[in-house]
Amino acid sequence: MRKSALFLLICLINLCSSAVYQNEEHYEPINDGPYVFYVNDSLKARMIENSVLREYYISAENYPDIKTAIHLSCQYKDLLSVYSQKADYRQKYNEVDSIIALSDVHGQYEKYLDILQANGVTDKELNWKFGKGHLVYLGDAFDRGDKVTELLWHLFTLEKQAEKAGGKVHVLLGNHDDMALSGDQRYMNEKYRKVEELTKINYSDLYSGSSVLGKWLRSKPVMITIDDILFVHGGISIDMVRMKLPVKEVNKLFSGKILGKAIAPDNKNIKVELLAGDNGPLWYRGYFEDSTFSENRADSILNFYDSKHIIVGHTTFNNVKVLYNNKIIGIDAGIGYTQPGEVFIYKKGIFYSGSVTGERIKL
């Protein structure tokens, strides 16, 4: 009996030792950041390197020396500028002859870089090379993938580079961006739970209004128009037309009443209730999933917004999806689910899809 008990004890010890060994063998240190905050009239960066939290105080004097260490390539003044940046709710742009749009990258940073380089938006050093063209990012940087921070900082930096070249980067908000800022972690990658543990900061607070990226994201719109093309993450429902919600008001309501906020069940604002719900611009899928949706309804929406085309993400397909002779175009081609993806291209009045090989197909 004693021999049997001793044998079982030895087996148990060996099993535990094996489990510990396997955990050590498969343990992978994480790297993330920086998360830059405005604290007591100065900037403070938090970085995680090999699962060790490091903190840096940033000033105009030391920034040239530490920017490489904190993995930033933007200018010091760019970090500070977000705190004086005012939201542009109108978001109307005219006379643009080159546009590239993509959506729903969800932290798949390498695939995002591959498709931007293949289609002439960035060079091999990841810098802007699209001249006076406009890049539209249609939302959902957050969730699923494990390189959300890298994606956001690249968009942040690219935005500044584009401005200097006479171009423009438009970062629109998606439902997962709003979820992340609101503290909804249902789709968050496990890596960021470890980030929370190491920083001792809730993930949504890493993007609070006192952080550079959080403040920057809170200045971003939900809808924009470029010439006769309307861009929005999910879509525009007929309910928004019936409520007569123009682009400017939608962006203003999201900025002031919805983004990063939990909508109370007893909310009395019917506009906020509509915009934050399934028929709002971040969540709507009716173009592709509502069997009653028709071209006539699409025309009513386009007429109200004085547009001829609506470009959306959110609903995933294998390729760019076209409805009603290019009146509605869905451009979420699965990058967020690790597919190669596609981009939407507008060049001098002609629409194309662009692949990761750089091939263009006329839509």
What does each of the following model-derived ranges do?
Residues S18-L363:
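Feature recognizes metal-dependent phosphohydrolase scaffolds
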Residues M1-N23:
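Bacterial Sec-dependent N-terminal signal peptides
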